[in-house]
Every structure is written in structure tokens, then in C-alpha cells.
Amino acid sequence: MLFHGEYTAYIKSGGRVQEAVGKNRRMERSSMKRKFLAMTLALAMGLSLAACGGGTASTPAPAETGEVEATTPAETGSTGDVITVGFAQVGHESDWRTASTKSAQDVFSAENGYDLAFVDCDNDSAAQLEAVRNFIQQGVDYIIIDPIVSTGWDAVLTECEDAGIPVIVIDRTIDDSDKYVSWVGSDFKVEGLACGEWLKAYAADKGITEINALVIEGSVGASATIGRTDGFKEIADREGWTILDSQSGDFTEAGGQEVMESYCQSYAGQFNVVICQNDNEAAGAMTAMDNAGVTYGVGGDVILVSFDANKPYVQMVMDGKINANFECNPMAAPTVAEIIQQLEAGETPEKEIYVSESWFVAEDNVSTITVNGEEQECIYVTQEVLDARPY
């Protein structure tokens, strides 16, 4: 168990760990970059002098850039003390994603001895692969990937491996687990199981004997979508619940509203549970149900459940608009920084590290649930609980 301020990371070992790349190897790459820069400057000066002797030199046109913009890491100093980190982020589709990005920018700051090259891939998997390859060309010391999809990574991870750049995966997972150093994130299936176990206990307490659920899934192919779907479906199948429909809202508010509007038309009066796989989808679903005259939350006709538990949506739990919200902790960056420091010291980090998470509920009738044989607390949201939320 590792402690990172307010956050606890649960560790699970397994798989082949890529060879640790420490300070000496990083300094070798830094030295190579400095030599290359010196050669480039020398050549540029020579060309400049030749141009001055032979007439006027034309101003070169700026190089064309792709659609993906990134902050470029500065050259490391002569001591190689600054650690350059490339971060290929999924995008900016949700409040959770914004919190994840801010965490990385805060942790990998100049004040902390880092130079962060950040790329918002805007949910474009091809752009994400390009971003990682650009990081390799830039010669960063470490690469962080929050993968848009879990497949198609073998070639680019092999390129990272060949370049001697350790890769750390956060949040979502990828299939090529032998080609990255560590993964830091959530157990998405456990989140789905917890949702199902809470709903089972809540329905029993309220005397609800029939569950007819609608699910608004996240992005197709994302490990968060797969895990939450599989976990909830496992409980639904066991309990004999009906899942009327399940469609992707792409983890966005607009997507959640669009899917829920369709549901309100197709299943009017037939559903009593809506499961949204993130907070932004829940916001869209609430708008659609408001427009359709469907009541939800505490005292409503529909039990509304969300995932992520960003602070504004935990507020909605306290207000009774959302019945339960299952946290997905976006603060992976402190744990990633610890992994980097382990690699710098020549140590081998754990392969899988799970961040701690909590389950938030609007009523105090279900205080605990059992998930995979482990009793877990359901936190009744009060103002004190809300004030303590860091994001």
C-alpha cells in the first residue's frame, strides 16, 4: 500500500516489467540531445555566415504543424536534472478529464523539476499514436499515456522500448501489457459491481421488486466502458433485472442528452433506473428527463446513478438529484511521479497500482455493500463530506 497525500494506491503485481531506466540512462539521452543541438547550432551559424558573405538570405517559412498542438519540452540543463515527460491525454470531454489533466500539470511542473510536454488528443486515437511518436522524436525521458482505446498499441510501444523510453499508462488500460512499465488507475469492473450491489440493496430497502434499467455507456472500446458495463451486467444477470437498452453517450454531456432523449421516446413509462457511466452523461440525461417530464433522484420515479464523482456531481448527490455516484479517482499523477522517481533510482516499480475510490449515496439506508467478498462503505453525502472533496 502506497500513500500519496490524501490518496491511497493499492498495488497488484504481475506481468513482465520493462527494465528500469534510471538517471544514468536519462543523462546519456540528455547528452546526446545536447550534442545534436550543438551540431545543429554550429551548422546554422555556418550557413548564416555564408549567407552574410554572399548576399541576403531569405527568411525560411515556418514549418507546418499538425492539428494536434503540444507544449514542447525545453532542453535539459547540463546536469540533466530536469526530467522531461510527455503526456498523451485522451482529450477534454469531461470534468473528470479536466481534473486528470490539471493533476498532471500541477505535479509535473517546473517547480517540481519536470518539463511537461502535453498533448490533448481530442478523442482521436490516430492523433494519440502520432503524439507518442513525436515524444520519441523529441527524446523525452518518460511517456505517460491515457489510452483512448485499448488495442493497436503494439507497434508504437515497441518503438518506445527501442528508444529506451519507459511508458507509464494511466486510467484506461491497453492490451500490450508487457511493453509498458506500470499502469495506474481504477478497477472499472469493481466500480460496475459496486453499482449493481448498491442498487440491489437500495431496491430491497425501498421494496422495489422489479428493475428495468437503461444504460448510457461511455466511449466504445474504452476500458472504463467495458469494465463498468461488465460489472453491472454481472449483477443484473444474477438478480434477473431487465436492461432495456444500452447505448454509447461517448462520455459527453451532449451524448448523454441525445441518448436519453431517444430513451424517453422509445421507453416512456417503462424504466425505473438510469445508469450513466460518467457525470457528464448524467448531466445530459437529467436535461433530457427534465424536458420529458420524467422525475428522478430521491423521491422521483427513476433511480439515477452516475460514475466519476466529480465534486459538482457529489453536490447533486447531496441535493438528491443523483441517487448514487461511484468515484473514479483522476489523481494518478502523484503515483506516476513516484514511479518515475523509482525508475530514476534504478528500482523496479509495481506493474499495477490501483488508486483508492469511494462510493457516494444520497440516502443513509445503505451504509455498506459487499463487492468480491469485501465489505465496502457507502458514504452518505453531507456538507462536511462535500467540503472535503479535492476535485
For the regions a language model picked out, list residue spans one by one.
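Short, low-complexity disordered leader/linker segments with a strong preference
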Residues: 1-84, 110, 158-165, 375-378, ...
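Hinge/cleft segment of the Venus flytrap/periplasmic-binding protein
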Residues: 70, 74, 81-83, 216-220, ...
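Hydrophobic alpha-helical segments within soluble ligand-binding/sensing domains
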Residues: 78, 85, 128, 184-211, ...
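Extracytoplasmic "Venus flytrap"
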Residues: 84-111, 116-134, 140, 146-150, ...
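Short, solvent-exposed amphipathic alpha-helices that sit
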Residues: 96-110, 114, 191-198, 223-241, ...
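Short beta-strand elements at the ligand-binding edges of bilobed clamshell
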Residues: 118-120, 175-201, 246, 319-330
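Hydrophobic alpha-helical
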Residues: 137, 141-162, 232, 245, ...
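Flexible loop/hinge segments that line or gate small-molecule binding clefts
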Residues: 151-190, 212, 310-318
